[in-house]
């Protein structure tokens, strides 16, 4: 076998690994599963990536990057209001999860099993605390415009409303006999509704910008 690695093959392996890891998690995935998904033999997989652990580390880092990509720009945009930032964060994650519905279950399961790499490589709370959004939120509290002084409650509400329906999709669709297309339509409706709900909970009447 040549010592020159083909980047297209490497990318194909990573794409296959991403798909399989997202569906089965680290513990449930065999390297043979990834090789089959990539359409290569097991020896070639080992040539490009020496271990399942190494390949998983790459996939996890890329997944976290995708999950938080663009949020920093939204949180620190001086030209948008607090209300607009809420709308954009919801839209950002709704669009991502409609494309990658297995992503939240994968991330939560793997972070729960091994939280240290996530904490070390994703200082999201620190970034949030020093963001333009946090400053705008504090100003809104001081002005008496919003009802909840703790930003973390609002963050958790947004995360829960956006992400939980994707985690609960298998249960909901089975119990309600809803097909995937109908469920996707429901998620698209929520993309518009969630910011309305958050603002209705958060802002005092006639105090939203």
Give short role names for the model-derived ranges.
Residues 12, 20-54, 58:
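Helix-turn-helix
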Residues 92-95, 99, 127, 131-143, ...:
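C-terminal peripheral helix-coil segments that are non-catalytic and often amphipathic
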Residues 98-119, 169-177:
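Amphipathic alpha-helical segments used for helix-helix packing
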